[in-house]
């Protein structure tokens, strides 16, 4: 069974290495150490399924919205996102599961009043967390939140940082996509 080794203080797929042969374990550990300032990392089962991402915002300790997005991925040693699109069609049950995972992660990491960027994988109808960070996503994801929901996401993040109570509710949605060339 393949494994994935992950640096815990990196992002953008840096320090994530798949290992198929346990005899290469030591060299893989040394490679992961190049991407971290910590003296530990995560080792987990390699999962195959449908990957998707999500943008979210946590305010007052509660997830205010979750916007699942599809990812355009460059496949090298590991997949690297090079673009995204919304909406990413998922059953409501899967979206609720992803939102619950986001809430649990935010609680565990003590994240509050911040954007959240998440990567998930869907395996046999179950949502697994690949990576979550207390930041807005890259590759035009903040702009896609603004376009999709028809509000200025940057303004909402600034309002929250100033201690205001921004309203993330929207009745409008505009499909959109962005990709690095």
Predicted regions: what is each one?
Residues 12-13, 49-51, 175:
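Short acidic/glycine-enriched loop/turn segments that link adjacent beta-strands
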Residues 156-181:
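Peripheral (often C-terminal) accessory segments that flank ATP-dependent C-N-forming ligase machineries
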Residues 16-18, 42, 129, 178-180:
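Conserved hydrophobic/aromatic beta-strand scaffold that supports enzyme active sites
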Residues 1-15:
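A conserved helix-loop-beta module that forms one wall/lid of the active-site cleft
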Residues 135-156:
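ATP-dependent carboxylate-activation loops
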């Amino acid at each position: 069974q393949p494994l994935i080794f992950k640096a815990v203080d990196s992002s953008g797929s840096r320090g994530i290495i798949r290992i198929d042969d346990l005899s290469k374990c030591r060299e893989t550990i040394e490679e992961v150490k190049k991407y971290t300032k910590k003296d530990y990392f995560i080792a987990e089962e390699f999962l195959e399924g449908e990957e998707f991402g999500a943008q979210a915002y946590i305010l007052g300790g509660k997830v205010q919205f979750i916007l699942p997005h599809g990812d355009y991925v460059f496949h090298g040693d590991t997949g690297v996102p090079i673009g995204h699109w919304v909406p990413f069609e998922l059953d409501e049950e899967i979206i609720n599961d992803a939102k619950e995972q986001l809430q649990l992660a935010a609680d565990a990491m003590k994240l509050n009043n911040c954007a959240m960027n998440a990567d998930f994988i869907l395996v046999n109808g179950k949502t697994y967390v690949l990576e979550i960070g207390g930041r807005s996503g890259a590759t035009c994801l903040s702009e896609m939140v603004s376009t999709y929901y028809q509000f200025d996401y940057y303004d909402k993040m600034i309002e929250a940082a100033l201690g205001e109570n921004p309203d993330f509710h929207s009745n409008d949605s505009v499909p959109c996509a962005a990709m690095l060339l």
